[in-house]
Amino acid sequence: LSYPRANVRGMTTLRLAEVTTDNVGAACDLSVAPHQERYVAPVARSLAEAYTQPGVAWPRLVYAGDDLVGFVMAAFDPGCPIDYFRCGIWRLNISAEHQKKGYGKFAVEAVLAEARRRGQESATVLWVPGEHSPEPFYLRLGFQPTGQQHEGEVVARIQL
């Protein structure tokens, strides 16, 4: 499988990679900034959720060159009765020391490219509102709140 690649700040090649026995430990060690912890689950929890939903969850690691810088998990479930869970981003964890370098944007764009490849017309993301929420980040990328909420989280959608 090949995934979108991009260059950010010089010659660093960004890529997504599957989680394997060789990188799962490092993936579980990724941590966001302390003020972000209430907004995103740890990678280990995300991987446990992915394990329980094979064929739906799409967990990937974000690399800048050989450095593991983040984790993203999407979901592709076209038959889901809840429309905003049919195609979307479930998690985005960029390690604290690697934020504000374009890696999160790359990860989201890579998920959207995968969604397009799968024939999806839109994708969603949910976030917990609050002072340090990822809302401004997702709005800058083109996601728009739908007016819906799920368990207190804002539902936003982007057309592909």
Briefly describe each language-model feature range.
Residues 100-113, 139-140:
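Conserved acetyl-CoA-binding loop-helix of GNAT-fold acetyltransferases
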